[in-house]
């Protein structure tokens, strides 16, 4: 490593405070995208309420962060006409909107503080296992 390399800032280096605000949580409940026109029409709102309830006591992210999300979806989220399940972008939109009410509520620009995002979905065998696993780690950009 040259002296010039030593002076270059790390793009995603942890801040000294970052280790205090690492969030690793599985939000229990069935993830939903948007409002439903048939079936259990209250289910998306119930999911939003669960996200807010289960994340409201967590530390607030105020600066840049990295986020990883894994949606844990029950079998009925994978019907024959959608064998890969619901769209990730739609699942993520509702989740991030809800997190803007809790852990991202003090971040300038709301969820724009997320500088790196990894998202996936996987099928679980029951409603009891369903939810969303989130990891959030503040970084210096």
Language-model features: where?
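Acidic, proline/glycine-enriched N-terminal capping motif
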Residues: 2-141
